[in-house]
């Protein structure tokens, strides 16, 4: 039994986590290209 609140939190955290990883990877790539 998955609680709706827990399900909502997970569904909310997934995009935030993916966005954070994408931004971190982009910053590393940009920094590597600049050097």
Swiss-Prot record:
Chief location category: plastid
Bilayer disposition of the protein: Single-pass membrane protein
Entry keyword Membrane: yes
This protein's GO CC annotations: cytochrome b6f complex; organellar chromatophore thylakoid membrane; plastid
SUPFAM superfamilies hit by this protein: PetG subunit of the cytochrome b6f complex
Subunit text: The 4 large subunits of the cytochrome b6-f complex are cytochrome b6, subunit IV (17 kDa polypeptide, PetD), cytochrome f and the Rieske protein, while the 4 small subunits are PetG, PetL, PetM and PetN. The complex functions as a dimer.
Family: Belongs to the PetG family.
Name under which the protein is recorded: Cytochrome b6-f complex subunit 5
Organism of provenance: Paulinella chromatophora
């Amino acid at each position: 039994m998955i609680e709706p609140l827990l399900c909502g939190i997970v569904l909310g955290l997934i995009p935030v986590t993916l966005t954070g990883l994408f931004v971190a990877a982009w910053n590393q790539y940009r920094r590597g290209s600049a050097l």
